[in-house]
């Protein structure tokens, strides 16, 4: 009964980590269980969310949720008095989510211009930049920028205006693009005259003119769309790297092509050690990343890709950070 409670808590925490990655950071991850060789030393088992960096062909252990059982309570004599008045060993879980997450986000979404931040985690979601021309109503443009920021902030959108007069608009564009701000709003004389603003997306560079009388609604829609687009683009790139293999020769080719490999495995520790040894090279050895909790169907008679023994599960493999 207690072990079941521990198991459910492990999965509950793992789901929270998946939500952080996918719903906030717009990074697709795989929920899975680690092999005995890769699990937390001393624990009963380890689950993880695994991310993948298509540009480098490497996996990243995004976060872990461990069931420790009573192993450590026995080791350190951690007791409690149960409802029967008897001494009993505690059951423990452990979970971890570290700053490597920031690095994963940068590598998954970033481009040659700099950071690309998902709106849900961006400290500044919208940057408003005045674009005054010679002999233009500079003060009117600045006032419109401030009014725009005020409107957005009142609605809970994290917005700011860059009103510095010692930098050109073009310099400011590059400055905020490098910092990954999801949406840029430009206001110039023509925009002022037409009661509109120009919005520019960081993720794809798309530009659109927005009427000021429905600005808030349009900005909210853009922010939501940017968040969804980042996740969908990242998932499409990740999925394009997934390769199913069933033989050792196919596995070796997929490793050389920096793929995220899904293969049938016999779940034997010595076989995994052999895979590491046989793929060791300048880029590092391939290893098991996780066995997905949602297992694809295993056809009867399927053999392990590495040993030829009967396969018991599907497992993701690849090089990793």
Question: Can you annotate each of these PLM segments?
Answer:
Residues 1-321:
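NTP/phosphate- and nucleic-acid-binding module
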């Amino acid at each position: 009964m207690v072990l079941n409670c521990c198991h459910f808590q492990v999965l509950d925490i793992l789901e929270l980590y998946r939500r952080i990655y996918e719903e906030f950071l717009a990074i697709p991850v795989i929920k899975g269980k680690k092999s005995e060789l890769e699990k937390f030393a001393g624990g009963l088992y380890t689950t993880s969310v695994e991310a993948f960096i298509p540009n480098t062909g490497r996996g990243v252990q995004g976060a872990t949720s461990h069931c420790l059982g009573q192993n450590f309570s026995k080791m350190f004599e951690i007791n409690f008095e149960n409802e029967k008045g008897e001494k009993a060993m505690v059951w423990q879980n452990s979970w971890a989510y570290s700053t490597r997450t920031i690095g994963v986000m940068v590598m998954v979404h970033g481009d040659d211009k700099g950071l690309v931040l998902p709106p849900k985690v961006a400290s500044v979601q919208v940057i408003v930049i005045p674009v005054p021309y010679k002999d233009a109503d500079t003060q009117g443009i600045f006032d419109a920028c401030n009014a725009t920021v005020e409107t957005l902030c009142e609605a809970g959108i994290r917005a700011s205006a860059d009103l510095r007069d010692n930098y050109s608009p073009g310099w400011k564009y590059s400055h905020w693009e490098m910092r990954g701000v999801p949406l840029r709003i430009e206001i110039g004389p023509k925009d002022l005259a037409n009661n509109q603003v120009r919005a520019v997306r960081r993720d794809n560079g798309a530009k659109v003119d927005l009427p000021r009388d429905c600005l808030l609604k349009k900005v909210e829609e853009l922010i939501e769309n940017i968040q969804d687009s980042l996740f969908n683009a990242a998932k499409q790139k990740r999925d394009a790297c997934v390769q199913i293999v069933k033989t050792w020769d196919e596995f070796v080719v997929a490793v050389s092509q920096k793929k995220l490999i899904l293969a049938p495995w016999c779940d034997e520790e010595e076989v995994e050690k052999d895979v590491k040894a046989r793929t060791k090279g300048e880029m590092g050895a391939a290893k098991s990343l996780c066995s997905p909790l949602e297992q694809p169907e295993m056809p009867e008679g399927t053999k392990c890709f590495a040993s030829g023994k009967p396969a018991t599960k599907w497992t993701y493999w690849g090089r990793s950070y």
